[in-house]
């Protein structure tokens, strides 16, 4: 008889608009025929309810359990008061001097206990459906690990190590006592919480090692994420001098990485080759776009695109990520689609690519510019495309992922 597997998620991973969405979706999809699948997920304002039907077409076996946080005021008076409160809060924020410590408060917020209503919801789901295994994903809802019945085996998928990202951010503010305190607090909380799980899955062996070094004693398995790969690779190589950056600004490493590239590399590249263009794919807030366009008016923001390949084919993808952990799905996507790429060391961390063989890897802005210019060589582009694509096909297949996850669940 099949066991009952509950996925507890911060969002429904569909459509596949980000690397996180893809990693979660493929993790569910690969075991959908091996378990009775239940998916509890948060629903927030802006959620398109039609997405639920689209998801069901892809994984009809799943029982979907939305945690709808949208609230409607009971009457007109309450709605007016609610709107006034939000307007006053926004105006008060404008009048308040910027506090550089606000971002450190967000570190504390990220692993807070989930609202009582949804803790009880998850508990009731576990009892109603006799859940055998519950799998929590993404750091900002990791505290659900603490809300599960003792009869349920607890698995946590660590997409990104919070303490790694915070530690890198702290390097830019080394004398801030409050920041140091927040870092130590969140680190202790993160490690303690992870030790309450029965098993932890990381998406790279590097993250597994870092967790063990910080004192995690729960068994850890390095799994991986996958992307869809075409059976036959048809490289699309042109003389176009186009760079692409893929990723939304709600992921802080994307914001920091793009700004780092624009500040340290972009103008130097344009001085050497004025014809280069830079296109940014993914949803970005208008204020963030305008902030970048002020000093870099030639950057093109394309927003979310329905067909990523058609948008980035013929380009060189840049992955200038400087903070964070986990695995960069954008690199796996590029390799699977036949898109050559250049990356920082952090950007490619945990992915078995080698500098000069599959891509170019460097943290030196000057060398990064030189590497981009080297990729004007069509033969070198083709070499990188073929080598990286072969790596993805060999190490990131759906069946390999399925066997990996089943081995983990069998150990519980």
Residue spans of the language-model regions?
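Conserved nucleotide-sugar donor-binding subdomain of glycosyltransferases
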Residues: 81-133, 139-142, 174-196
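A charged, aromatic-enriched C-terminal amphipathic alpha-helix characteristic of glycosyltransferases
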Residues: 379-410
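Active-site proximal beta-strand in glycosyltransferases
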Residues: 5-6, 148-170
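Conserved catalytic-core segment of nucleotide-activated headgroup transferases in glycan assembly
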Residues: 222-297, 301-308, 312
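Acidic donor-binding loop of glycosyltransferase active sites
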Residues: 198, 312-326, 337-339
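Short hydrophobic beta-strand element within catalytic cores of glycosyltransferases
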Residues: 330-333, 340-344
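Conserved acidic donor-binding segment of nucleotide-sugar-dependent glycosyltransferases
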Residues: 356-366, 373-379
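Donor nucleotide-sugar binding/catalytic pocket of nucleotide-sugar-dependent glycosyltransferases
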Residues: 155, 180-183, 191-232
